[in-house]
Amino acid sequence: MASSTDVRPKITLACEVCKHRNYITKKNRRNDPDRLELKKFCRNCGSHQAHRETR
């Protein structure tokens, strides 16, 4: 089972516009301590939008 101090935890990315949680990925907590933000395709909006890490 993954611990809460895992170096590469699973994170969920949610669309900034429609707030749908579209992607699940992993990130390295040591290299990226802040919230991750990527431009990804949102199927709900039908265009590329900023997706931000949710907690």
UniProtKB/Swiss-Prot annotation:
Q: Where are the transmembrane segments?
A: none
InterPro entries on file:
Ribosomal_bL33, Ribosomal_bL33_CS, Ribosomal_bL33_sf, Ribosomal_zn-bd
Q: Which domain of life is it from?
A: Bacteria
Q: Report the sequence similarity comment from the record.
A: Belongs to the bacterial ribosomal protein bL33 family.
What gene does this protein come from?
rpmG2
Q: What is this protein called?
A: Large ribosomal subunit protein bL33B
The UniProt GO MF terms for this protein read: structural constituent of ribosome
- Taxonomic lineage: Bacteria, Bacillati, Actinomycetota, Actinomycetes, Mycobacteriales
Q: rRNA-binding: present as a keyword of the record?
A: no
User: Per the record, what is one GO cellular component?
Assistant: ribonucleoprotein complex
